[in-house]
């Protein structure tokens, strides 16, 4: 700042001195009536004044140019500086765009990684769902008792399928293990490539920051900036090539991983299916073998104890439920104990306070309920502990007296005793089916003498209609008493 003041003062003083000297010279030239270049004295004086003024201006500019290098470069190199500044700004803009593109690609890679984690969670959810379905399939095994006859004929096929399924399961397990190893290796490679790409991006960001700082310092380092920018441009180009190569490798790895994971999901699905089939076939085979050997003492869904309960006091309800569970335990002990053994004090049922409280909450409202204790699985003699489940249902009217349960037709003239007996058994089975669907677990009781009814049917000589009707009002607690009637031309001619 002091140098500027001195420079301005020197220019003012020097300009005044030169102007004064020029005026004196012009005055003396005018008085002396000198003539230059054959001009008149007056014109000569004017010319001398012009020359002194030009000298003042030239001296001023010379002092400014000599004293301030920036002013000298600004006057003579202004266009070059502006042109170079525009080029540097364009290069900075391109570098910022490249930086933005790299950040977008990095975000894209992060999104793909997040998608991979989401897919993994979906696979785990599907696996949990498959386990639930497996549990449901185990519960449906109660229906296998009705398929006993068909299972006996298919035993050879089941054993063959079992062995084949075991072989396929082992093969799938080996493939899955190999693919899991390959997937883990590819994931490790992907993480390495991502780390290298991230490192390259961070290095490029640092280079861009240095470049931005160099642009801001262009007034102080203008002479060396061009070379530094060229070096940085070369580094950026190299980094761009490296990033492009890394991105290409990552894309290829991602594609391979996606294919491997897809194949792994297929194999896992196939493995789950084969495991379910193997478990189902093993249970079928075990149930068939136990039935064949006569070992099953309790079957799934068998009623261990039942009672009709109506109370609204928690203590009384708890006492009744405990007594019912004790009765179920005694009945199970009788079924599972070996002949001649003492099983009176053996606790077979897994009874917990939580299950008792759950039953109390279900029936403790003052209404009448039917509570049944069922066997939760198939058990052989000698078992020391079994699972059970309880069922509660309102004890309501299910069938009114004289309500028709099932109907069939028969012609005693053309049917043998065995065929007639089969037709009646089918009628009774249909009645049992309706009773079970309505919630009555107790068996069907035939009201009257069944054999006498069959004998009288054999004596008829015309086609008849046979109906199974409820002998009395039947509630959920049961049992259902059935009366068989034979109808001919709309009239009841026989009845049990």
Swiss-Prot record:
Full protein name: Uncharacterized protein alr4393
Region (Disordered): 113-137
Keywords, ordered alphabetically: Membrane, Signal, Transmembrane, Transmembrane helix
Keyword hit for Signal: yes
Signal sequence interval, chain numbering: 1-19
GO cellular component, one term: membrane
Compartments, record wording: Membrane
Superkingdom per UniProt: Bacteria
Topological relation to the membrane, as annotated: Single-pass membrane protein
TM helices/strands, residue ranges: 45-67
């Amino acid at each position: 700042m002091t140098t500027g003041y001195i420079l301005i003062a020197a220019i003012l003083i020097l300009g005044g001195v030169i102007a004064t000297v020029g005026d004196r010279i012009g005055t003396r030239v005018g008085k002396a009536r000198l003539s230059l270049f054959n001009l008149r004295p007056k014109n000569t004086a004017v010319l001398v004044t012009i020359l002194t003024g030009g000298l003042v201006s030239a001296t001023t500019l010379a002092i400014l140019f000599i004293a301030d290098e920036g002013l000298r470069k600004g006057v003579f190199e202004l266009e070059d500086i502006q042109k170079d500044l525009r080029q540097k700004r364009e290069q900075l803009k391109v570098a910022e765009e490249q930086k933005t593109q790299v950040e977008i690609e990095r975000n894209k890679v992060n999104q793909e990684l997040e998608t991979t984690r989401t897919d993994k969670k979906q696979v785990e959810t599907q696996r949990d769902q498959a386990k639930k379905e497996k549990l449901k399939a185990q519960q449906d095994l109660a229906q296998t008792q009705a398929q006993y006859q068909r299972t006996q004929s298919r035993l050879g096929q089941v054993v063959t399928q079992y062995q084949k399924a075991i072989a396929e399961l082992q093969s799938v397990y080996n493939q899955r293990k190999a693919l899991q190893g390959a997937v883990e290796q590819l994931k490790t490679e992907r993480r390495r490539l991502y780390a290298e790409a991230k490192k390259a991006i961070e290095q490029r960001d640092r280079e861009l920051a240095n470049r931005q700082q160099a642009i801001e310092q262009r007034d102080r380092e203008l002479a060396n900036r061009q070379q530094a920018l060229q070096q940085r441009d070369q580094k950026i180009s190299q980094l761009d090539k490296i990033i492009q190569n890394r991105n290409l490798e990552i894309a290829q790895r991602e594609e391979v991983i996606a294919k491997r994971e897809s194949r792994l999901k297929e194999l896992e699905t196939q493995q789950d299916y084969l495991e379910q089939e193997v478990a189902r076939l093993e249970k079928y085979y075990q149930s068939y073998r136990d039935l064949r050997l006569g070992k099953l003492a309790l079957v799934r869904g068998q009623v261990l104890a039942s009672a009709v309960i109506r109370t609204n006091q928690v203590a009384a309800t708890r006492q009744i439920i405990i007594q019912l569970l004790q009765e179920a335990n005694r009945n199970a002990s009788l079924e599972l104990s070996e002949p001649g053994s003492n099983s009176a004090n053996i606790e077979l049922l897994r009874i917990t306070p939580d299950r008792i409280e759950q039953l109390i909450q279900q029936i403790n409202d003052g209404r009448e309920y039917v509570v049944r204790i069922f066997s939760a699985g198939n058990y052989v003699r000698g078992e020391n502990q079994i699972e059970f489940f309880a069922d509660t249902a309102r004890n309501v009217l299910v069938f009114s007296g004289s309500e028709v349960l099932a109907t069939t037709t028969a012609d005693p003239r053309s049917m043998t005793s065995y065929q007639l007996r089969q037709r009646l058994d089918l009628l009774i089975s249909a009645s049992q089916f309706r009773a079970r669907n309505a919630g009555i677990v107790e068996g069907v009781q035939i009201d009257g003498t069944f054999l006498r009814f069959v004998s009288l049917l054999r004596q008829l000589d015309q086609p008849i209609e046979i109906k199974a009707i409820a002998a009395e009002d039947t509630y959920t607690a049961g049992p259902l008493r059935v009366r068989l009637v034979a109808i001919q031309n709309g009239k009841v001619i026989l009845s049990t």
